[in-house]
């Protein structure tokens, strides 16, 4: 079983990218579990066709310790196993701590013991690489990390920060970076810039996802692009990304860069000039 965590700054399209990629892998015959590690609890919405998924933390708050796996796990598109860790009540507690609680509970309930599982995907909020959000890295819950990024300064800054987290836990947790996924914002020279960033970080840009309105249309209809419009070229982009992840063999401990180098990249490609 391959355990993959998808990180990236908030609003970058991480959950959308994860779910569409998972749909591509499911279509290719793989059995997958998706664990949402974001307090917004939107990591499985498209796979469940908008069905409200009761989060692990909400279930624990309401049911106490008497929780069974079926309470926190729903089957979605193509038999995908879907679960959301959720977050604390607003203004109370730590969302990162909630991720730790959720993953531990899933382990206790035997969620990972399904022998048919080929992949587990963790969809993780990535602006803050605090202890809880770093848990999939820190405790070896995930072995491969992919970072969703775009040609915008803060998305690149977050990607670099996440790489620092990977370096910190690479030896103890055994995790490696599998590559950057560029979710395009149609920034000038974006593809070249992210390829250059990947090179500086010692990794690869595993795929460039073009900006396309069908993604939003599919989301409004609570579906992945692959389910909503399977013949569309954008569906093929996600299939291609799924195939590249499935066949990927380039895993590295990244080499994070200084902020000055990041700014130089932006100047070189004309964004900050």
Curated annotation (Swiss-Prot):
Disulfide bonds: none annotated. [4Fe-4S] cluster binds at residues 94, 130. SUPFAM superfamilies: P-loop containing nucleoside triphosphate hydrolases. It catalyses: N2 + 8 reduced [2Fe-2S]-[ferredoxin] + 16 ATP + 16 H2O = H2 + 8 oxidized [2Fe-2S]-[ferredoxin] + 2 NH4(+) + 16 ADP + 16 phosphate + 6 H(+). It is an enzyme of class 1 (oxidoreductase). GO terms for molecular function: 4 iron, 4 sulfur cluster binding; ATP binding; metal ion binding; nitrogenase activity. ATP binds at residues 8-15. Binds 1 [4Fe-4S] cluster per dimer. InterPro entries: NifH/chlL_CS, NifH/frxC, Nitrogenase_Fe_NifH, P-loop_NTPase. The modification ADP-ribosylarginine is found at residue 97. Keywords: 4Fe-4S, ADP-ribosylation, ATP-binding, Iron, Iron-sulfur, Metal-binding, Nitrogen fixation, Nucleotide-binding, Oxidoreductase. The reversible ADP-ribosylation of Arg-97 inactivates the nitrogenase reductase and regulates nitrogenase activity. It comes from the Bacteria. Its EC number is 1.18.6.1. Its cofactor is [4Fe-4S] cluster. The keyword ATP-binding applies. One of its GO terms (biological process) is nitrogen fixation. The keyword Kinase does not apply. HAMAP family: NifH. The key enzymatic reactions in nitrogen fixation are catalyzed by the nitrogenase complex, which has 2 components: the iron protein and the molybdenum-iron protein. Belongs to the NifH/BchL/ChlL family. Homodimer. This is Nitrogenase iron protein.
């Amino acid at each position: 079983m391959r355990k993959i965590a998808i990180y990236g700054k908030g609003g970058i399209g991480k959950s959308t990218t994860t779910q569409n990629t998972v749909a591509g892998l499911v279509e290719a015959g793989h059995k997958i579990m998706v664990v949402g590690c974001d307090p917004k609890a939107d990591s499985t919405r498209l796979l469940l066709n908008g069905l409200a998924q009761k989060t692990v933390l909400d279930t624990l708050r309401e049911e106490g310790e008497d929780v069974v796996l079926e309470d926190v796990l729903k089957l979605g598109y193509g038999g995908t196993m879907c679960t959301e860790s959720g977050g604390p009540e607003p203004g109370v507690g730590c969302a990162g701590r909630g991720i730790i609680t959720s993953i531990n509970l899933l382990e206790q309930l035997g969620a990972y013991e399904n022998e048919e599982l080929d992949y587990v995907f963790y969809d993780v909020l990535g602006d803050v690489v605090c202890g809880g959000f770093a848990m999939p890295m820190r405790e070896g819950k995930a072995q491969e990390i992919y970072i969703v990024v775009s040609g915008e300064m803060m998305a690149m800054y977050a990607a670099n920060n996440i790489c620092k987290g990977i370096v910190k836990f690479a030896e103890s947790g055994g995790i490696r970076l599998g590559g950057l996924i560029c979710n395009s914002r149609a920034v000038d020279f974006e593809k070249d810039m992210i390829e250059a960033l990947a090179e500086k970080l010692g990794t690869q840009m595993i795929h460039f996802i073009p900006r396309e309105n069908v993604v939003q249309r599919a989301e409004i209809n609570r579906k992945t692009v692959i389910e909503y419009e399977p013949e569309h070229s954008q569906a093929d982009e996600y299939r291609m990304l799924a195939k590249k992840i499935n066949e990927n063999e380039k895993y590295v401990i990244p080499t994070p860069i200084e902020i000055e180098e990041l700014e130089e990249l932006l100047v070189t490609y004309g964004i900050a000039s």
